[in-house]
Amino acid sequence: MPTECAEVVISKGQDELDFVASMLHYLKVGGIGIVILPMSCAGNSGTKLRAELLKHHTLLACMTMPQNLFFDSHVGTATCIMVFKAHIKHDENKSTFFARWQDDGFKVIPHNGRKDAGGWNAIKSTWIDQLDGTAAQDEYVWLKKKIKTSDEALAEAYIKTDYSKLSDNDFEKVLKKYSLFKYMDEQGILEG
């Protein structure tokens, strides 16, 4: 039996958590399973199956990933990485690592995909420092928190939002995107 497994799952529905259960089943006791999932699996919509998973396995970490992570694959699903320790019940007295890693230093280049804008190595180093606990905890970026099996496992449930960084321009941009989405939806442009 393997001690480590990493998988990418970008489908819809609760089949993702069933897949995670299968992956963890095949790992040795204490083996580490790392999976990229839609954020809904870590949020409220995945509560029942996730709670069942945590009766048998430990959630070590959950990190929200950049919005355009799978841009090259034409998949628009918001994702997170979840890290599990197999066959060891989740201990509600131990902390789980949560991070909002939405900027990986890559930029979307039309017709070229995501490309490193020169910041990836520094960002990777920062993320490693956060994971191993050598970086100062920042409640707006990452933290460690004790959670129950019935709690959300999504970083956004626990990490604070710094509203001081929002501008009127940000608000206008979101409204314009939403207006365009509504128009395209009403015109049937988004269907099939």
What is each of the regions a protein language model found here?
Residues M1-G192:
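A conserved structural/catalytic subdomain of Rossmann-like adenosyl-cofactor enzymes
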